[in-house]
């Protein structure tokens, strides 16, 4: 992968990557793709899949944190409230 392709990939949104992945899957499902082109599509699809996975992981990490009142990031945890029914 060239440096310019890598930069384009990094700037791609999750939605753009998913759309590209869906287009590739559609082309491969048609079945009228020469082997060499199918391999190229597969490689491109795996790259887009990895990009989507990385973007989702990044968002999950962001969601693990909430803003404290003083503006600092703090881990978010859910504590069960005592119901007092003991």
UniProtKB/Swiss-Prot annotation:
InterPro entries: Exonuc_VII_S, Exonuc_VII_ssu_sf
Family matches, as PANTHER family: EXODEOXYRIBONUCLEASE 7 SMALL SUBUNIT (PTHR34137:SF1)
Superkingdom field: Bacteria
Record's subcellular location: Cytoplasm
GO process annotations (BP): DNA catabolic process
Name this protein carries in UniProt: Exodeoxyribonuclease 7 small subunit
Annotated EC: 3.1.11.6
GO molecular function: exodeoxyribonuclease VII activity
Function: Bidirectionally degrades single-stranded DNA into large acid-insoluble oligonucleotides, which are then degraded further into small acid-soluble oligonucleotides.
Assembly description: Heterooligomer composed of large and small subunits.
Similarity annotation: Belongs to the XseB family.
Swiss-Prot/TrEMBL catalytic activity: Exonucleolytic cleavage in either 5'- to 3'- or 3'- to 5'-direction to yield nucleoside 5'-phosphates
């Amino acid at each position: 992968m060239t440096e310019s392709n890598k930069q384009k990939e990094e700037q791609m949104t999750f939605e753009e990557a998913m759309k590209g992945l869906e287009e590739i899957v559609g082309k491969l499902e048609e079945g009228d793709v020469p082997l060499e082109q199918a391999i190229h599509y597969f490689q491109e699809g795996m790259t887009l899949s990895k990009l989507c996975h990385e973007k989702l992981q990044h968002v999950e990490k962001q969601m693990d944190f909430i803003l404290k009142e003083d503006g600092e990031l703090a881990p978010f945890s859910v504590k069960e409230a005592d119901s007092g029914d003991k």
